[in-house]
């Protein structure tokens, strides 16, 4: 009998297991893959402050590179460049980072089983590909796969290739906006170091494989090292994180950012909060304590995620012509102001700045108004 079984050896799942085991309880992590950390779906962007809050100190293996600037391109080829030095953003190797957290969880006493799939819940535990396991609590960290039957409109197809190319700039992330090619999202280039980078595309109902190939051909010569196809979730947190003895964490709970689908920090904190709350419920023999996990996560991220969802609604409703006009309205002062921000994970104010609407309704003439006005009002 385990105190908790966690399905999914993701960062969120491993952090959940770490906190449960840290408190002296037994936790079992089920990972369906052959190893923790693979395949590497994530772009790997995270701030040093976020990693510190997650209790992770980067090793030489898990650190790839440091990001100094972000270059954002409009559909007609204009661009702005933002100094991101103050945000202290790094690119991490998710395969190694997840293994690092797996070692933390194991050192506290958690058990990790690879090549083991979760098949379903049974009265006293869970059914797995390696037999039934009894447990008191079940934690769903299976990622976007858990959301497929909840709301398909919130799931975007994504392709990310790891490539070697001489056009990848060290220390610079590139974002390409194009509502015709990547509706509701964008293409990106994230440098990993030594001429290697992660190149990806995502958007509503796109043919990700074809579009990433077109993007790469347009960029120049390249060699593909690895191909990853994985959906992302962009609709924010699900309605409830807990039901009876089941706890949902990470991407499965919709805890990735609605704007970029990034979730190392927000999903990781979800894992820590869930693990601590489960430990408290076990210690007090009171499963009603589980609701504290959801309350804590929403208190930390709820307001920011609501604003990011509003920003997403606005951005999904504008066309390329409008995006180009917005780029024309961005002033050096706006860029300097955004560059001065030091928080990578709570970034709605920067989005408002980029829309050119802080303190005015000029851009409202280009957009359909209710969400925009609400977004502006949340910025004070």
Each predicted region: which residue ranges?
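Beta1/beta-strand and adjacent pyrophosphate-binding region of the FAD-binding site
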Residues: 1-12
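Hydrophobic anchor at the start of a short beta-strand
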Residues: 4, 17, 25-27, 138, ...
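Glycine-rich FAD pyrophosphate-binding loop
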Residues: 7, 21-41
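Predominantly flavin-linked oxidoreductase catalytic cores and closely associated redox partners
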Residues: 9, 103-224, 238, 254
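Conserved N-terminal glycine-rich FAD pyrophosphate-binding loop of Rossmann-like flavoproteins
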Residues: 33-55
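A conserved beta-strand/loop capping segment in the N-terminal third of enzymes
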Residues: 49-100
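FAD/FMN-dependent oxidoreductases across multiple families
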Residues: 205-283, 291
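C-terminal helical "tail/cap" subdomain of flavin- and related membrane-associated enzymes
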Residues: 279-380
